[in-house]
């Protein structure tokens, strides 16, 4: 009746039977990396992760404590202190630009803070760390912007990792078989997540619809090192806190990562 070429769903909606029965061409949005919390909860080791940097903290004359999750929504992220933090995290003296040796700092799990035992007085420091994305950033964005109520937080999973990769292929086949009314599958988010960060009040802290910093994991970083032949540094992605947004000139290392 409206003369539409096709009917399409979107995040937060499901096709009602009335639309399926119209005879119109149907486009269906398919979520490769989410909308299956049963799988995500059963395989937390293959949850998507991201690199995040703390604010700058200035040292005085004694030990400096840097809380990791200040200014970050705990609905969105959870610190990954399960994997080797001495290899995957990086503490940087931003005054000199040099990384702080791992022997000179330690992690206090109870307070989720990094403690630098003997920092240089009045130097500024940051911590770059890995965090699990426990709420898909786009799903959170859509939920916040549209003020959705009582919506289960969709957990993103990394389709590049072995178990989830095999499951994803099977899941897609099953989807096609169980949705015969769909004419065109409109994929969204093949494997990498946009870098969308919210604070404790669900306010937008950092939004980049082109970024790759929310698509990392120890598994992927190992693949990176094997392919390029040199050691990965969190700073390749953190980029002094700019996260390699589209206004930055990318480094060789970041282009290698892409």
Protein language model features and the residues they cover:
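Glycan-processing catalytic domains of CAZymes
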Residues: 1-258
């Amino acid at each position: 009746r409206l003369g539409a070429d096709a009917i399409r769903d979107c995040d937060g909606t499901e096709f009602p039977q009335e639309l399926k029965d119209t005879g119109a061409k149907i486009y269906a949005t398919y979520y490769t990396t989410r909308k299956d919390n049963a799988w995500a909860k059963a395989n937390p080791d293959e949850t998507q992760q991201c690199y995040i940097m703390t604010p700058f903290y200035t040292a005085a004359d004694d030990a400096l404590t840097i809380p990791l999750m200040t200014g970050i929504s705990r609905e969105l992220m959870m610190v990954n202190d399960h994997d080797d933090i001495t290899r995957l995290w990086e503490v940087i003296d931003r005054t000199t630009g040099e990384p702080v040796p791992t022997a000179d700092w330690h992690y206090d799990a109870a307070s989720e803070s990094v403690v630098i035992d003997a920092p240089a007085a009045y130097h500024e420091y940051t911590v770059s760390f890995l965090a699990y994305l426990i709420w898909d950033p786009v799903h959170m964005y859509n939920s916040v912007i549209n003020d959705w109520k009582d919506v289960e937080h969709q957990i993103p999973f990394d389709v590049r990792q072995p178990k989830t990769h095999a499951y994803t292929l099977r899941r897609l086949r099953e989807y096609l078989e169980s949705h015969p009314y769909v004419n065109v599958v409109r994929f969204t988010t093949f494997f990498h997540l946009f870098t969308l960060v919210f604070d404790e009040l669900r306010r937008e802290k950092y939004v980049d619809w082109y970024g790759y910093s929310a698509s990392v994991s120890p598994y992927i970083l190992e693949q990176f090192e094997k392919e390029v032949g040199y050691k990965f540094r969190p700073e390749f992605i953190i980029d002094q806190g700019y996260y390699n947004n589209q206004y930055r000139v990318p480094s060789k290392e970041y282009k290698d990562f892409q």
